[in-house]
């Protein structure tokens, strides 16, 4: 496997089996934070594209192993989205996929910014943007007859960090590093046996349910504002799953970011597909 890094030379990038005849690589820069994968913006004599490579670990936390084949899942999801007119413009088109080296070349959606600033109170999602994000979820959840590779390993990784580790009394995380006092506050949750049973059941459903195509990581880091447009990226935790999970994660991150409380009802009113609100609230936490 060719191991690409942020410092890989233009010469070596030029040698990748991704380029058109006569196309010359001119520039490479890091494109975004890239929690899971290496993500580079490549400018050539003909175009600007995004190059992604998955590793056998989480790029931001190399000590955490992760399924290296996750790009295959993302590729299949992006191709399914590109075939659905209502949501095709939200996400990049797959231009080339090189399975041997876990490399994917994507359409460059343009320079933009994600919504991570909302956690610090520096950004507010407008009702119009909220509606657009709900319409995106409605659109992908409505996609049927798609063949997505099984994502059990990625689903298990997500399950571990959402439904299991946070509810262990001794999980190795010091929550006071995030906010002083949070560690003590967490004890009321890690010692609650009734809550533990409910979380276990919900986690089991998350692992087993496969009725809809889901994004799988629908949070502000996956939403991009590019000019006046909204884009959605990085569905590597997606696949066939539980639509209520996407909605619950959406709501939970709006809660964390202290967005207007009325947004929750707006989301559930605008979402037009059948969904169990109790499940959504369960995933929301």
List the predicted regions and their residue ranges:
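Juxta-kinase regulatory segment immediately upstream of eukaryotic protein kinase catalytic domains
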Residues: 1-27
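Active-site acidic catalytic loop and adjacent metal/ATP-binding pocket
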Residues: 29-44, 49-51, 197-245
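Short, well-ordered amphipathic alpha-helices
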Residues: 10-14, 76-82, 198-199, 268-271
């Amino acid at each position: 496997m060719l191991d690409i890094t942020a410092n890989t030379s233009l010469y070596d990038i030029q040698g990748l089996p991704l380029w058109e005849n006569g196309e010359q690589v001119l520039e490479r820069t890091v494109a975004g934070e890239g929690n899971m994968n290496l993500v580079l913006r490549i400018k050539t004599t003909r175009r600007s594209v995004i190059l992604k490579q998955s590793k056998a670990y989480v790029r931001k936390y190399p000590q955490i192993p992760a399924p290296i084949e996750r790009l295959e899942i993302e590729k299949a999801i992006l191709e399914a989205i590109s075939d659905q007119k209502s949501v095709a413009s939200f996400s990049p088109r797959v231009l080339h996929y090189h399975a041997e080296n876990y490399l994917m070349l994507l359409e460059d959606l343009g320079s933009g910014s994600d919504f991570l600033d909302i956690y610090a109170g520096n950004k507010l999602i407008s009702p119009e943007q909220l509606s657009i994000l709900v319409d995106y979820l409605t659109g992908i959840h409505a996609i049927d007859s798609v063949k997505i590779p099984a994502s059990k390993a990625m689903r298990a990784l997500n399950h571990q960090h959402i439904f299991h580790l946070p509810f262990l009394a001794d999980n190795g995380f010091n929550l006071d590093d995030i906010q002083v006092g949070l560690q003590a506050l967490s004890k009321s949750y890690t010692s609650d046996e009734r809550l533990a049973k409910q979380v276990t059941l919900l986690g089991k459903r998350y692992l087993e349910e496969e009725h809809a195509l889901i994004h799988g990581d629908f949070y502000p880091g996956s939403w991009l504002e590019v000019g006046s447009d909204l884009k959605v990226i990085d569905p590597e935790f997606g696949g066939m799953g539980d639509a209520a999970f996407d909605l619950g994660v959406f709501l939970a991150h709006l809660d964390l970011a202290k967005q207007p409380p009325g947004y929750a009802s707006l989301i559930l009113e605008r979402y037009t597909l059948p969904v169990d609100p109790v499940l959504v609230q369960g995933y929301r936490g």
